[in-house]
């Protein structure tokens, strides 16, 4: 979409039509091409929720990761849990959930119950008192290629699953989706060009976006890089 403050897509299209009508021949064709390209590069489009079952329900988000991921960064789960819940909480008027468990409560539970990963999904949902449990199994989290301490090549991936505790099968996922994001977008970015905190923050924010966006309608840039 053309980057014109205060103008919606319909208004922009009408203005384009008026401009083209006032021109003729090659000029009109050239202008149409430029405008179409600008629209594609700077515009956005609506993306509908992949899972709509949060409406009218309470939810919790819990993240599991293997010892390698946790050993490399013991705070990763804390940051991701809070980041994802924060994005979902900020959009509660869109997805329509009627309540959620704060990240600090989930993390406190995980700390106090170190064997929680052996619990059934239904039991976890009951523990939090929610109708929907968003369970995220982190599968890969790295900031660079193994053995290369000089170039950034961040990857964060995981499987998102939703348990419907009030459904017929509270111990089985009613919905699943694989998520994978990368940062930086270009190769060859060195540790001197960007620091660890920047790479980490961008990678985790992209992952949190992709998880949260599964649950509500939203706008995405046409040329989004993740």
Question: What is each PLM-predicted segment?
Answer:
Residues 138-141, 163-165:
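Beta-hairpin (beta-strand-turn-beta-strand) motif
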């Amino acid at each position: 979409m053309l980057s014109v403050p205060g103008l919606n897509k319909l208004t922009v299209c009408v203005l384009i039509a008026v401009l083209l009508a006032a021109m003729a021949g090659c000029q009109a064709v050239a202008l149409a091409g430029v405008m179409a390209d600008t629209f594609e590069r700077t515009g956005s489009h609506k993306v509908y929720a992949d899972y709509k079952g949060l409406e009218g329900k309470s939810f919790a988000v819990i993240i599991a990761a293997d010892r390698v991921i946790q050993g490399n960064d013991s705070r990763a789960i804390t940051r991701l849990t809070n980041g994802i819940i924060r994005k979902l909480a900020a959009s509660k008027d869109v997805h329509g959930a009627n309540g959620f468990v704060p990240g600090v409560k989930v993390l406190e539970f995980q700390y106090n119950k170190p064997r929680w990963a052996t619990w059934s999904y239904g039991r976890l949902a009951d523990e939090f008192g929610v109708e929907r449990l968003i369970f995220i199994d982190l599968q890969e989290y790295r900031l660079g290629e193994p053995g290369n301490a000089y170039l950034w090549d961040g990857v964060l991936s995981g499987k998102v699953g939703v348990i419907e505790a009030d459904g017929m099968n509270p111990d089985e996922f009613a919905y699943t989706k694989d998520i994978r994001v990368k940062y930086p977008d270009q190769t060859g970015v060195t540790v001197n060009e960007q620091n660890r905190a920047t790479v980490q923050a961008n990678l985790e924010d992209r992952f949190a976006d992709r998880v949260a966006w599964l649950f509500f309608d939203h706008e995405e840039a046409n040329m989004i890089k993740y």
